[in-house]
């Protein structure tokens, strides 16, 4: 009789562990889809999207988020920002903040998470700062597209 109780307890624990793992996997999929949507809003290429997802999975696996809000938008934005830096497609934090929900995630939270990522993974260390020419070229291209669209209307 005692063995049966222990077996039942073991089954309950196994079910609980399976449910936790399933929930973790579902949460990860939801985060990756949110990151995909953020990247699409910024107009990023697929290589940057994939690199950002890999950074997030790496951070999730090494438990960088322990003690913090695990699935905060700041961590997603930090992954996108560092992926852009590493792929030499510079962005500024303000641009990234625009897709994160704006007022929800302040620059200080995003910068803090970027610092944590840089400390743990040594990413983004040997890359220069964002140059004004890169930003000007991208923003002028966007303005040109807007003026041609408005003239067609």
Mark where each language-model region is:
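Non-catalytic, interaction-prone regions of core transcription and DNA-replication machinery
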Residues: 1-153
């Amino acid at each position: 009789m005692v063995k049966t109780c222990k077996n039942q307890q073991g089954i309950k624990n196994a079910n609980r562990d399976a449910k936790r793992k399933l929930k973790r996997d579902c949460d990860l999929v939801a985060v990756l889809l949110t990151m995909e949507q953020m990247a699409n809003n910024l107009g990023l290429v697929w290589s940057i999207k994939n690199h950002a997802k890999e950074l997030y999975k790496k951070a999730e696996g090494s438990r960088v988020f322990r003690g913090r809000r695990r699935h905060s938008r700041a961590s997603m934005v930090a992954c996108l920002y560092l992926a852009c830096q590493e792929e030499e497609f510079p962005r500024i934090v303000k641009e990234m903040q625009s897709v994160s929900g704006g007022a929800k995630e302040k620059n200080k939270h995003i910068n803090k998470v970027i610092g944590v990522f840089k400390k743990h993974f040594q990413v983004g260390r040997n890359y220069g700062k964002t140059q004004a020419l890169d930003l000007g070229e991208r923003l002028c291209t966007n303005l040109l597209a807007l003026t041609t669209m408005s003239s067609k209307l």
